[in-house]
Amino acid sequence: MPSIIIDIWRHEGFCQFQNGLYYIVNPDEWQDVVDVWMENTPFEQLGKFYALARNAFGCIYNPDTGTKLTIDTILRTISGSIKGYFTEKEREITISGLFAMISKKRVEFEIDDKPIFKKAVKKLGPLGWYEMYAFEPAFALIGDAALTMDNLVKVDARVHMLLLRDLIDQPKIWSFNIEEDLKRIGTSLAEIAEKHRP
């Protein structure tokens, strides 16, 4: 792990912010979820990915292996871009940026362009460490019709994220163009993977 992550863990520990909207997590506890979501995607060739943070609605964040990725388990997407190999300074800036966005709007989940976290807490109570808010029936089964406050439930986060992956063939890749990114940085997936090999 990069030294900046160790420093963040040393100062903050594994913790939550804003009443459970955002968490700094132990990567080991979420590795099976990350591995399942990465399987058979273009990112798999880049090496191992780790969960460094998550939000209350099943998004997992990883900024560390030459890419910046977000796995959105509810909307069944993986978004990000290939940067190539990070220098140590670039890695520190990227990871610092991830944790700096804790108070930003983009860790929220919205319905009709309105954030719902406060409503979720009011309806279902605060989250435990291993819980998340989800929709039942799942978006993967019925699409946009799932995304209502009436369908919002509190669930075991890891179990639910694994279940959501089982409901789909492949995650959708958003805001990501592999060929253009690779051409821009003048490399290939194999070269990037080799640089990240332990």
Predicted regions and their residues:
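A surface-exposed partner-binding patch
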Residues: 1-70, 135-198
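Compact, glycine/acidic-enriched structural inserts
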Residues: 69-112
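An amphipathic alpha-helical core segment
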Residues: 95-169
